[in-house]
From Swiss-Prot:
Non-receptor tyrosine kinase that plays a redundant role with ITK in regulation of the adaptive immune response. Regulates the development, function and differentiation of conventional T-cells and nonconventional NKT-cells. When antigen presenting cells (APC) activate T-cell receptor (TCR), a series of phosphorylation leads to the recruitment of TXK to the cell membrane, where it is phosphorylated at Tyr-420. Phosphorylation leads to TXK full activation. It comes from Mus musculus (Mouse). It comes from the Eukaryota. One of its GO terms (molecular function) is ATP binding. Belongs to the protein kinase superfamily. Tyr protein kinase family. TEC subfamily. This is Tyrosine-protein kinase TXK. It is a peripheral membrane protein.
Length: 527
């Protein structure tokens, strides 16, 4: 091996012109190494990567022009991506604060800045600018199905059929996401010729290898909207042509993440109490109105029932959790005692009461749809790394459209009642807890999965108390010995298997909420 060195210099006389000068000429010195020395040198270079790098540069310049000593200019900074996208309003929105911008359904707007995931700065066609809720708009592209009235992103098969039967129009249709990822389903309502019976047919919209969409392979289309447009004029294999699109668009305003951007504290003078609608772990709950036009639920927190300072900080985090299957927290009132928690109002109240009051009237498909709603909300909390800690039918609420939403997520941590956090107390939700919680007080998303299995049992028993003839201590002993809840008579074996999978003794043996949602969706499509 030969090493080249440029560290030695010689002085030479320059005679090329009348003004002589002394220059330093770099002289390469070659050193021959033995085999042992060569191996030692390679080992040293591996131990000193900076040296090996230097040697590599020296070798590459051998016999060439000496590289410039000037450092290259740093690369120009990348321009931030342009956030200015065109959107279309899905709902009307009235400004709530001076910095808000009004939205009119179906109008186009330009997004100037995404302040956070839930509030964006926008400009209308008149040049007015302000903040808007991001869940009230969608990107205005032809390929974006959300701009079409007939498309429903978050809807179950049962909810679809209920909407179509309410309209009861020949050819009424809805397009929704299929249980098969990347495909869609058209649901069509039709009446029999004698007008005594009606039926709903479901057709899957598939995509072939060349990227074309179809229901039957005889009719291929480059996009889903073009497929829908064709079948609005031609049945072409469907039970009826697509006559009337059925949409939720604009009919039911979704809750916003807070009343405005970074507004978590609510002035109590802006609240009007209408009537008492119930009581919970923390105090009385009232139906109220915010600024006389937005219905809200107002929870008055009894003094001493909650660690208030800790909860106020947590409330700021909880407000950023926003999903169509979560009861939205709007803010808190802290200027007086008792403290008020202001949330989205749900017309049909507590799920547990809803089930008990309608016992014998609810179809199995609706019960499954309720479980899907809850599982969808819990899958969102799972993705957000947020633990509920007290998932049960009593902590879920039902909307006027029979959509079930999860309430009181995370609040169990701030209860100061010793009975609530003691496995021997009546208020502790032992009957919904897995072994690792009542033995070691260890919560995780998988402990929520156990509770979800018990909640499914509540739903399919139409509101029965789990382990109704056992005390909390007996429940702890029974669960520890491997005892599990029996199969409700309304639950087919496929449903009971899902429940039972949630009650694995080891958290690692339980499915995730994402996996549960996929299984429940597949079951719903076969009913």
């Amino acid at each position: 091996m030969i090493l080249s060195s440029y560290s030695s210099f010689q002085s030479v006389l320059c005679c090329c012109c009348c003004r002589c000068s002394v220059q330093k000429r770099q002289v390469r010195t070659q050193i021959s190494l033995s085999r042992e020395e060569e191996l030692s040198e390679k080992h040293s270079q591996r131990q000193r990567p900076w040296f090996a790098k230097l040697m590599g540069k020296t070798q590459s310049n051998r016999g060439g022009v000496q590289p410039s000593k000037r450092k290259p200019l740093p690369p120009l900074p990348q321009e931030p991506p342009d956030e200015r996208i065109q959107v279309k309003a899905l709902y009307d929105f009235l400004p709530r604060e001076p910095g808000n911008l009004a939205l009119k359904r179906a109008e186009e707007y330009l997004i100037l800045e995404r302040c956070d995931p839930h509030w964006w700065k926008a400009r209308d066609r008149f040049g007015n600018e302000g903040l808007i809720p991001s869940n009230y708009v969608t990107e205005n592209r032809l390929a974006n199905l959300e701009i079409y009235e007939w498309y429903h992103k978050n809807i179950t098969r049962n909810q679809t059929e209920r909407l179509l039967r309410q309209e009861a129009k020949e050819g009424a249709f809805i397009v929704r996401d299929s249980r098969h990822l990347g495909s869609y389903t058209i649901s069509v309502f039709t009446r029999a010729r004698r007008h005594t019976q009606s039926s709903i047919k479901h057709y899957q919209i598939k995509k072939n290898d060349s990227g074309q969409w179809y229901i039957t392979e005889r009719h291929l289309f480059p996009s889903v909207p073009e497929l829908i447009q064709y079948h609005q004029y031609n049945a072409a294999g469907l039970i009826s042509r697509l006559r009337y699109p059925i949409g939720l668009l604009g009919s039911c305003l979704p809750a916003t993440s807070g009343f405005s951007y970074e507004k978590w504290e609510i002035d109590p003078s802006e609240l009007a109490f209408v009537k008492e609608i119930g009581s919970g772990q923390f105090g009385v709950v009232h139906l109220g109105e915010w600024r006389a036009h937005i219905p809200v639920a107002i929870k008055a927190i009894n003094e001493g029932s909650m660690s208030e300072e800790d909860f106020i900080e947590e409330a700021k985090v909880m407000m950023k959790l926003s999903h169509s299957r979560l009861v939205q927290l709007y803010g808190v009132c802290i200027q007086q005692k008792p403290l008020y928690i202001v949330t989205e109002f749900m017309e049909n109240g507590c799920l547990l009461d809803y089930l008990r009051e309608r016992k014998g009237q609810l179809q199995k498909a609706l019960l499954l749809s309720m479980c899907q709603d809850i599982c969808e909300g819990m899958a969102y909390l799972e993705r957000s790394c947020y633990i509920h800690r007290d998932l049960a039918a009593r902590n879920c609420l039902v909307s006027s459209a029979c959509v079930v939403k999860i309430s009181d997520f995370g609040m169990a941590r701030y209860v100061l009642d010793d009975e609530y956090i003691s496995s021997s107390g009546a208020k502790f939700p032992v009957k919904w807890c897995p072994p690792e919680v009542f033995h070691f007080n260890k919560y995780s998303s998988k402990s929520d999965v156990w509770s979800f299995g018990v909640l499914m049992w509540e739903v399919f028993t139409e509101g029965k108390m789990p382990f109704e003839n056992k005390s909390n201590l007996q429940v702890v002993e029974a669960i520890s010995q491997g005892f599990r809840l029996y199969r409700p008579h309304l639950a087919p074996m496929t449903i009971y298997r899902v429940m039972y999978s949630c009650w694995h003794e080891s958290p690692k043996g339980r499915p995730t909420f994402a996996e549960l949602l996929q299984v429940l969706t597949e079951i719903a499509e076969t009913w």
